[in-house]
Amino acid sequence: MYICRNHPLAKQKSISFEQLQKYPCLSFDQGDNVSFYFSEEILSTNEYPRIIRTNDRATMLNLMVGLNGYTLCSGIICEELNGDDYVAVPYEDANNPNSTMEIGYITRKDNTLSKMGTLYVQELNDYLQQESKKMQQR
């Protein structure tokens, strides 16, 4: 889950659903015709006491800072692009067993990725390994 660096829960090793109840959940709205299977957030069908939907990433990032909001998204918040005002904290919740998200890509059967596609996937894997190490050091 992503929150701003100054959020009261930012230094936690992990965060549960109960700990988030008093903060607004920020959801990225991709429109009415998008299946929840393609949602960028885990637990997108949960009921939240306070939820703000936006279709603009800059607005979402500003609301994280201004309102101590959070998002349970799969999006990568890249420090080089967005600054270091945001942190990822593991979301762990025994009451929500579907709180992990698998991210992948789809290719046509019997096709291989292009050189550019292979490079892109490798860069993503490298980035995720770096971020995983950062989270383990917390």
Language model feature labels by segment:
Residues 1-30, 99-110, 125-129:
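Hydrophobic/proline-rich hinge and linker segments of small-molecule sensing/allosteric domains
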Residues 4, 55, 73:
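A conserved hydrophobic position in a structured secondary element of the catalytic/binding core
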Residues 12, 37-38, 81-83, 117:
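Short glycine-/acidic-enriched loop or helix-start segments at secondary-structure transitions
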Residues 17, 23-46, 75, 113-121, ...:
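Secondary-structure junction motif
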Residues 18, 52, 69-70:
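A residue-level structural signature of the nucleotidyltransferase/glycosyltransferase Rossmann-like core
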Residues 27-28, 46-59:
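Short beta-strand-to-loop elements that line the ligand-binding cleft
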Residues 58-109:
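Beta-alpha-beta core module
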Residues 61-64, 121, 125:
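Non-transmembrane alpha-helical segments in soluble domains
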